[in-house]
Curated annotation (Swiss-Prot):
This is Phage-like element PBSX protein XkdE. Pfam families: Phage_portal. It comes from Bacillus subtilis (strain 168). InterPro entries: PBSX_Firmicutes, Phage/GTA_portal, Phage_portal_PBSX. Belongs to the phage portal family. PBSX subfamily.
C-alpha cells in the first residue's frame, strides 16, 4: 500500500523589499578613547529619526515653539518701585536693564537669539544634546552666540580642577569667592577636519587645532567656548523619548506595509488546492508571472484561469486510460491576517506613547478633535504649568548663571516669556469690588487698559493717580470708568 503524499508550492513575488540606502556611520569611531568619549546612542540616527515618524517632530516643535517662541524679556531682581529702594541702586538697575536688553537683541546679527536657542533645543529634544558657541568681544566679554550642529559634536573627558571666581549676592552686596571646577572640552569634526572648543567659563587658553592648553597662543588659534544643553546628568544627554524607539520603528513599518498594500493593489492571499491531479506547467508559470507582476493598480482586477491535469489510472482491458476527476479549490487566507483596525490601533497607541514621553496633550500636536474651549484651556494651563514653565526656568537660569556675571549685570536678569492666559474682561469683573472699596489706584489699571487697547500705556506721573480713589479730595469715578471699559470690551467681542 502506497502512502499518500502532499506537495506544497509557495508562489511569491520575486521583487525585493525596499531597503534604506542611508549609512549611519560615525566619523568619530576611530577617535574614541581616553579623550573623546563615545555617545551611548548613534547621534546621526537620532538626529534624523524624526523624519521617519508621524508624531515625533510635532512634539519637538511644540517644545521649541513654547519654550523660546514667545521671546526673551528682562526683569528686575528686586522690587524697583518699593519705597525703601536706594535711588543709586535703582539707576544702576535701569542701566543694567538697557545693557541686557541690547545684549540679547545683538547676540546674533542674522537671526534672533531665540531662533539660535531654538535650534539647540530642537537638537536637545532629538538627541538629548544641544550646543551653542559663545563669541567674545575685544574686551573678553560674551557678545554673540552661534549654533553648533550636534551631529558633528562630541564630548571629551573632564580635565584637572582649575581655580575660578564665583560672584554672588549676600545682604545686598556682591561678593566674590574662589572655587575649584573641572572643565570639559568639545570637538567638532566636519569632512575629517577637527576643531576643539572649551567649556564656557574655562579661563585657560586652548589650541583650537589640538585641544591642548597652552600659556601663550596667537588669537586666531585660540578656541572659542561652547555651552552644552543636555537632558540628564550624564556626560551625554539622553532623549526623553528613547524608551519608545521600538514603537517608533514599529509604527514606521506599519506605515510601509500599508503603503505597499496600496502600491501593489488589492491581492488577497489564498491557498490553491488541487485534488486528484497536478497543476500544469503552463498554469504554474502563469501563476508565478502573476505574482511577479503584482505591483500597480492595473493588475488589481484580473481573471485567473487555472488548468489542472488529472492523474491517469492503470490501463483497462481495451488499452484505454481512466483519468481521475480533478478538484481545484481556492481558499482565501485573508481572514487569518491582521486587519486594518489592528494597524490603526497600533499606530494610535504608538502616537500616545511618544506624546506621553513629552508629557504633551494632543492639542499641542494638532490633534484637537475632541476639545472644546473649556477642556482646551485646562490642557494648555496644566501643560504650561507642568512642562513649559519649568523648562524655560531651567534654561534661562543656566544662561543667567553663565553670562550675566561676566557682563557685570546683577540687578536684572533674562527671562523667557510665556503665553498670557489672562482675559481682560474676567479681570475687570474681579477688580470691580476692589475699585468700589478704593483699594486700587488708576496707575494700577494702566497695564490692563494697555492690553485691552493693544498698546503700552505709561503710568501717570501725578501723585493723585498713584493713590486709590477716595483718599484724595479730587475723587475720580473709577468704578464708572471700569464699567464703561467692560461694556466696551463686550461690544468688541460681540461685533
Amino acid at each position: 500500500m502506497h502512502n499518500q503524499t502532499v506537495r506544497a508550492t509557495v508562489f511569491k513575488a520575486n521583487a525585493a523589499a525596499p531597503q534604506t540606502k542611508q549609512i549611519y556611520e560615525d566619523d568619530f569611531s576611530e577617535l574614541y578613547g581616553e579623550d573623546i568619549i563615545a555617545p551611548p546612542y548613534n547621534i546621526i540616527e537620532l538626529k534624523t529619526i524624526a523624519e521617519y515618524s508621524t508624531i515625533l517632530q510635532q512634539c519637538i516643535d511644540a517644545y521649541r515653539v513654547n519654550i523660546t517662541g514667545f521671546g526673551f524679556d528682562v526683569e528686575y531682581t528686586f522690587d524697583v518701585n518699593a519705597s525703601d529702594v536706594d535711588q543709586a541702586k535703582k539707576k544702576r538697575a535701569e542701566k543694567d536693564w538697557a545693557r541686557l536688553e541690547a545684549f540679547y537683541k545683538c547676540l546674533h546679527f542674522d537671526e534672533s537669539a531665540e531662533m539660535i536657542l531654538g535650534y539647540a533645543i530642537e537638537d536637545r529634544e532629538k538627541t538629548g544634546n544641544g550646543f551653542m558657541e559663545v563669541l567674545r568681544d575685544g574686551a573678553g566679554k560674551p557678545a554673540g552666540i552661534e549654533y553648533l550642529d550636534v551631529k558633528y559634536m562630541r564630548v571629551c573627558g573632564a580635565g584637572e580642577p582649575v581655580e575660578v571666581s564665583f560672584v554672588y549676592e549676600e545682604n545686598g552686596k556682591m561678593k566674590r569667592i574662589k572655587r575649584q571646577k573641572r572643565f570639559r572640552k568639545y570637538v567638532q569634526m566636519i569632512n575629517g577636519k577637527k576643531v576643539f572648543f572649551k567649556e564656557y567659563g574655562d579661563p585657560r587658553k586652548m589650541d583650537i587645532r589640538t585641544g591642548e592648553y597652552v600659556n601663550t597662543l596667537a588669537e586666531k588659534y585660540q578656541a572659542n567656548e561652547a555651552i552644552h544643553l543636555k537632558i540628564g546628568s550624564g556626560v551625554y544627554g539622553v532623549p526623553r523619548w528613547i524608551g519608545n524607539i521600538v514603537n517608533l520603528y514599529g509604527a514606521r513599518k506599519a506605515e510601509e506595509l500599508n503603503f505597499m498594500y496600496f502600491k501593489q493593489g488589492r491581492h488577497v492571499p489564498a491557498a490553491i488546492t488541487v485534488e486528484n491531479g497536478m497543476l500544469s506547467e503552463a498554469s504554474y508559470r502563469e501563476l508565478q508571472e502573476y505574482m511577479n507582476d503584482l505591483e500597480g493598480v492595473e493588475n488589481a482586477h484580473k481573471f485567473l484561469l487555472i488548468e489542472a491535469e488529472g492523474i491517469a489510472k492503470e490501463k483497462d482491458l481495451h488499452g484505454g486510460e481512466d483519468i481521475t476527476p480533478v478538484s481545484v479549490e481556492i481558499k482565501s487566507l485573508a481572514e487569518i491576517l491582521q486587519n486594518d483596525a489592528l494597524f490603526l490601533e497600533y499606530d494610535e497607541k504608538s502616537r500616545n506613547k511618544l506624546r506621553s514621553a513629552f508629557r504633551l496633550p494632543p492639542l499641542y500636536t494638532g490633534e484637537a478633535q475632541e476639545y472644546n474651549r473649556a477642556t482646551a484651556d485646562t490642557a494648555r494651563k496644566i501643560t504650561e504649568e507642568q512642562v513649559f514653565q519649568p523648562e524655560r526656568k531651567t534654561l534661562v537660569n543656566k544662561l543667567n548663571t553663565l553670562l550675566l556675571p561676566e557682563l557685570n549685570i546683577h540687578d536684572v536678569r533674562l527671562t523667557l516669556k510665556g503665553p498670557d492666559f489672562r482675559d481682560p474682561l474676567e479681570i475687570a469683573k474681579v477688580l470691580g469690588p476692589f475699585i468700589t472699596a478704593g483699594a486700587v489706584s488708576p496707575n494700577d489699571l494702566r497695564d490692563l487698559a494697555g492690553r485691552v487697547l493693544g498698546k503700552t500705556l505709561e503710568e501717570w506721573p501725578e501723585d493723585i493717580y498713584k493713590r486709590p480713589a477716595g483718599q484724595d479730595a479730587e475723587k475720580t469715578n473709577l468704578a464708572a470708568l471700569m464699567q464703561e471699559l467692560k461694556e466696551s470690551i463686550e461690544d468688541i467681542k460681540t461685533s
